[in-house]
Amino acid sequence: MAAAIADLPLIASGKVREIYDLGDSLLLVASDRISTYDVVHPTPIPDKGAVLTGLSTFWFEQTGGIVAGHLESVAEGVPDEVRGRAMKVRKLRMLPVEAVVRGYLSGSGWKDYQATGAVSGIELPAGLRESDRLPEPLFTPSTKATVGHDEAIDFDGAAALIGDRALAQRIREASLAVYRHCAEHALARGIILADTKFEFGLDSAGELTLGDEVCTPDSSRFWPVDEYEPGRGQPSFDKQFVRDWASSTGWDRNPPAPPIPDEIVARTRAKYLEGYELITGRPFSEWLARTGAHD
């Protein structure tokens, strides 16, 4: 289901995105595909690619004063057939670490804590419950697995992979600063940004630059504030909804992933759109109009 664009060289096709070469820049195209447990389902979620792109654009524009971002344009230089779900971005030398930040104890962080009392080697107070807010946001990096699952590592492991401890420290500081900014904004809009992951690279001048996507439903856990209750898993505006459904089917998390029923597709699309409009304060139709996308 890769998006074919005439005359543009396809550099990479991932679980959700295609990357095309524009010469001096790249074209990052978000599809409507959805993956859980690192496996892509055969059923797309309509408008998901446009929601991811619109939210990333919003956050890149919000956080440019914290760290440079790779976004160049969402309209100029973007082919008509992918407008709304594509970004023209700077070429970067990507760094081999997923920069994960956790503000709340959930997912693999909660499992780590239950087993060891720590997350990514960072000791935490005893007695924390699932979904509790952490005393401070934590930088809990992971590897970037080309096949299979990313693996959690500690800061020393991240610094070793990057090969430059000072650069790893800058990534940690930038990740925490961007997370805090986005989490504060989201909270004022009624959404808890529980955790997220970033990717960084170096531009042609060696400047640390935020790449990929920023605080989207695919890279983050978004929880509604008015339903937040520590001690359990939380309802969400992200793909946790599909993860929960997939887990309930008895699927063993190995390919192929099961098709997603129409009702789950419709509810997931509605969650994505609701999250977009709450966070940005703008109707989704405005994003489609801004980019010249076909509604």
Per-range role (PLM):
Residues 50, 54, 166, 170-173, ...:
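Generic recognition of stable, solvent-exposed alpha-helical segments in well-folded globular domains
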Residues 162-194:
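A long amphipathic alpha-helix within ATP-dependent nucleotide-binding catalytic cores
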Residues 133-165:
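A short mid-domain helix/strand-loop element embedded in enzyme catalytic domains
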